[in-house]
Structure formats: structure tokens, C-alpha cells
Amino acid sequence: HSECLTGDALGSLKCDCGEQLEFALQNISLLGGMIIYLRQEGRNIGLFNKVNAYALQDQGFDTIEANHQLGFKSDERSYEVVETILEHFKIDKIRLLTNNPKKMSCLKNIMIIERWPIIIPSNNHNVDYLKTKKEMMGHLL
């Protein structure tokens, strides 16, 4: 899970991050597993820039356009450290709870036995954000 202070801690309705984290924690409490929490706030543009991106979204830019307006790629995150962490714990196969195909493709030496989708209903504040993630970033929503 990539850090999202506004969603994870403050309950922002602009994204589904806090609900995704809660969904993952509930499933892990029932079935076992672990969360790897990555310090990549705002798709790795940082909290200050994320707040500026939110302001641009309020002006009508979508989440990708807002990042581009600030001089960033649509997604600045990387996931290579996940493989290192899993290897440290001698984990070579996983069931991955994600909607993000980029997370699956970065795990070169880890066998993904199964991908479990994270099903979170949209709300009036994040419906366009989720649509952009699906249509422009390839998220499996």
C-alpha cells in the first residue's frame, strides 16, 4: 500500500486509499498476510505537491493532468523494494491484493499465485478519480 495521509489517516473522500487499506487489513486479519506500507505519498510526489494537485483537480483537471501541470509523471511510484522485502522474509510466492497492474509487473522473482481485487464503491467525490485510474492508468476496477 502506498502511503496516503489524506485517505489513510484523515478519511479523505477524494480517493479510495483509506478504504483500500481498511479492506486489506480486514482480509489479512481473517486470512493472514502482510501489508507492505510504502512511503510514496501522492503517487510519490509528496504531500505538499499532492495538496496542490488536489487544488488543480478542484479546478477541473483530472488526477493525471494535475500531476502533469505540476511537472510530474502520472505515477512516480516504484515497487522494486517490495521484492526486496519479500525476499528478506523468504517469501517467493504470494496472493496479491491489488487493482494496480504496475504492482504485479514489477515482481520479477516473486510468483503471484492469485490477484485479489479490492472492491470499494465509489462516492460523489471520487467517481471521476476512479474512472481516470481505470481508463487512463489501467487499474483493474
Curated annotation (Swiss-Prot):
Per its record, what are the GO molecular function terms?
A: GTP binding; GTP cyclohydrolase II activity; metal ion binding
Q: Which InterPro entries match?
A: GTP_cyclohydro_II, RibA, RibA-like_sf
**GO CC annotation: what is one?**
cytosol
Keyword annotations from UniProtKB, A to Z: GTP-binding, Hydrolase, Metal-binding, Nucleotide-binding, Riboflavin biosynthesis, Zinc
Report any one BP term from Gene Ontology: riboflavin biosynthetic process
Cysteines joined through disulfide linkages: none
Amino acids binding GTP: H1, S2, E3, Q20, E41, G42, R43, T63, T98, K103
**Keyword GTP-binding: yes or no?**
yes
**Keyword presence, GTP-binding:** yes
Looking at its record, which EC class is this enzyme? Answer: hydrolase
Question: Under which pathway is this protein filed?
Answer: Cofactor biosynthesis; riboflavin biosynthesis; 5-amino-6-(D-ribitylamino)uracil from GTP: step 1/4
What is written in the cofactor note of this entry? Binds 1 zinc ion per subunit.
- Where on this chain does Zn(2+) bind? C4, C15, C17
Family of this protein = Belongs to the GTP cyclohydrolase II family.
Q: What does this protein do?
A: Catalyzes the conversion of GTP to 2,5-diamino-6-ribosylamino-4(3H)-pyrimidinone 5'-phosphate (DARP), formate and pyrophosphate.
The protein depicted here goes by the name GTP cyclohydrolase-2
Q: Which organism is it from?
A: Sulfurospirillum multivorans (Dehalospirillum multivorans)
Its gene name is ribA
